[in-house]
């Protein structure tokens, strides 16, 4: 069989940053392989793995084992694991899963063709840099796997924060920004292909530019992206509160294309726990930032994440999170039970909170947030929102998102329309009903 006739399927797990890596790998493979969506049709299967928390690790291993079945039941000849789990546990994966023919770490995304070639030849190919240094640019081939109307733009790679519970700096390397010119050229190309919304992502988006330019460049980057014709929404994800400057607030406020939405992961609401997590700043400072954001941008939607059951977390410290959630009333809040990640400082502590209590606290917080989110959503009933149409349903109904909804992690807007709507178009929708996560409405004629 000629290489050009071989079919490759890429299975992506984890976060949008992983998705971008899969898109770059797919772009490189397009010249030599047919890309297929169904693994059962593929001669080569690539699993781009995640290892952020224990459940993600388990999902990645399960997926590798599931895909390995196609070596017996399907036509798969070569099975390769890439991404964070492969970077962290490459040797162990090769030893424990004999069906694996290759391993590739996070720093070798652009070397996927060489990896496949070696994996097909030798059946034991390990490429996993100790300290990943790779960062893609706009010249690399990339096949977007997201719907045509939006795209993720990775402005930086790696992380220098070293939160005590997190393994990411070890599997993604030091923080490194792309050049502003590279990002702008990529967004211009996306706009020419019909992309309406760009989501700026990194492990720490607010840090963008500091390593490369000696200053935080996110405000100027946003202003330049806003000048690109065709881009209508700019969404900020993964923003650290201590680096969110007054300049950045002003740019958000004065740039209509910036979504009135902010993903601001806080992780906890008690200063002692924050310090033990190696999170910079205090909860009072975070509260001050939130107050300022809501004062300057009254219609902003705020998303955060919290960790329950961090080592040593007392009931009193957990209640600080509960009271903070009640006081701040986030529009979106995701809670995760602490995951004990080996090789992290937090995992070495002897005062681990029992798993049952971690989960109980997580469930309690999410139950509270469900009620808060429902109440927060009611303010949109009767208002007219700009909605990006993304899916057609039967009976003249469509699914879209407002600027308050990031794709895949937030809610949607269900839209009734007497006329046909086009996927990727913006329409004005009068909101008639709201639940905790989704909105319902009718197209404004």
Curated annotation (Swiss-Prot):
Binding site for [4Fe-4S] cluster 1: 15, 50, 84
Keyword tags: 4Fe-4S, Cytoplasm, Iron, Iron-sulfur, Metal-binding, S-adenosyl-L-methionine, Transferase
Example GO molecular function: 4 iron, 4 sulfur cluster binding
Cited Gene3D superfamilies: Methylthiotransferase, N-terminal domain (3.40.50.12160), Nucleic acid-binding proteins (2.40.50.140), tm_1862 like domain (3.80.30.20)
Any single Pfam family the record assigns to this protein: TRAM_2
EC number(s) per entry: 2.8.4.4
Main location: cytoplasm
InterPro entries, alphabetized: Elp3/MiaA/NifB-like_rSAM, Methylthiotransferase, Methylthiotransferase_CS, Methylthiotransferase_N, Methylthiotransferase_N_sf, NA-bd_OB-fold, Ribosomal_uS12_MeSTrfase_RimO, rSAM
Transmembrane segment boundaries: none
Superkingdom assignment: Bacteria
GO terms for biological process, alphabetical: tRNA modification
Cell compartment(s), UniProt: Cytoplasm
UniProt-listed SUPFAM superfamilies: Radical SAM enzymes
CDD domains linked to this entry: Radical_SAM
Cofactor: [4Fe-4S] cluster
Cofactor annotation comment: Binds 2 [4Fe-4S] clusters. One cluster is coordinated with 3 cysteines and an exchangeable S-adenosyl-L-methionine.
All copies of domain TRAM, residue ranges: 378-445
Ranges where the Radical SAM core domain occurs: 145-375
Stretches assigned to the MTTase N-terminal domain: 6-121
Binding-site residues for [4Fe-4S] cluster 2, renumbered to this chain: 159, 163, 166
Reactions listed under catalytic activity: L-aspartate(89)-[ribosomal protein uS12]-hydrogen + (sulfur carrier)-SH + AH2 + 2 S-adenosyl-L-methionine = 3-methylsulfanyl-L-aspartate(89)-[ribosomal protein uS12]-hydrogen + (sulfur carrier)-H + 5'-deoxyadenosine + L-methionine + A + S-adenosyl-L-homocysteine + 2 H(+)
Cellular component, GO annotation: cytosol
Family statement drawn from the similarity comment of this UniProt entry: Belongs to the methylthiotransferase family. RimO subfamily.
Protein name in the entry: Ribosomal protein uS12 methylthiotransferase RimO
Organism of provenance: Desulfitobacterium hafniense (strain Y51)
């Amino acid at each position: 069989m000629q290489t050009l006739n071989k079919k490759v399927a890429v299975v992506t797990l984890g976060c949008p940053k992983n998705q971008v890596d899969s898109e770059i790998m797919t772009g490189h493979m397009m010249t030599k392989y047919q890309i297929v969506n169904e693994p059962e049709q593929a001669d080569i299967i690539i699993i781009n793995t995640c290892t952020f928390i224990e459940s993600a690790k388990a999902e990645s291993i399960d997926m590798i084992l599931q895909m390995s079945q196609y070596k017996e039941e399907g036509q798969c000849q070569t099975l390769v694991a890439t991404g964070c789990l492969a970077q962290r546990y490459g040797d162990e994966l090769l030893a424990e899963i004999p069906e694996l023919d290759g391993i590739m770490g996070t720093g070798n995304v652009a070397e996927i063709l060489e990896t496949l070639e070696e994996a097909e030849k030798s059946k034991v190919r390990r490429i996993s840099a100790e300290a990943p240094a790779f960062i893609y640019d706009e010249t690399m081939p990339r096949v977007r796997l997201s719907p045509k109307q939006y795209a993720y733009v990775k402005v930086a790679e790696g992380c220098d924060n070293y939160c005590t519970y997190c393994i990411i700096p070890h599997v993604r390397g030091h923080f490194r920004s792309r050049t502003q010119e590279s990002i702008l050229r990529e967004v211009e190309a996306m706009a020419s292909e019909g992309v309406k919304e760009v989501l700026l992502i990194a492990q720490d988006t607010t840090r963008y530019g500091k390593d490369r330019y000696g200053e935080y460049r996110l405000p100027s980057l946003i202003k330049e992206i806003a000048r690109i014709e065709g881009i209508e929404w700019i969404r900020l994800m993964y923003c650290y509160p201590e680096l969110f400057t007054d300049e950045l607030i002003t740019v958000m406020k004065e740039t209509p294309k910036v979504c009135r939405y902010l993903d601001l992961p806080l992780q906890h609401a008690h200063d002692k726990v924050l310090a033990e997590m190696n999170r910079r700043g205090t909860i009072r400072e975070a509260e001050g930032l939130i107050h300022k954001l809501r004062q300057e941008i009254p219609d902003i939607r705020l998303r955060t994440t919290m960790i329950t059951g961090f080592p040593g977390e007392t009931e009193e410290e957990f209640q600080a999170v509960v009271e903070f959630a009640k006081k701040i009333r986030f529009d979106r809040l995701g809670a995760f039970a602490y995951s004990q990640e080996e090789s992290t400082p937090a995992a070495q502590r002897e005062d681990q909170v029992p798993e049952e209590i971690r989960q109980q606290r997580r469930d309690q917080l999410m139950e509270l947030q469900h009620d808060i989110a429902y109440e927060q959503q009611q303010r949109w009933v009767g208002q007219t929102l700009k909605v990006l149409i993304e899916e057609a349903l039967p009976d003249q109904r469509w699914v879209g998102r407002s600027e308050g909804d990031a794709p895949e992690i937030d809610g949607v807007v269900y839209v009734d329309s007497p006329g046909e709507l086009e996927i990727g178009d913006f329409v004005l929708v009068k909101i008639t009903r709201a639940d905790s996560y989704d909105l319902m409405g009718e197209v404004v004629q």
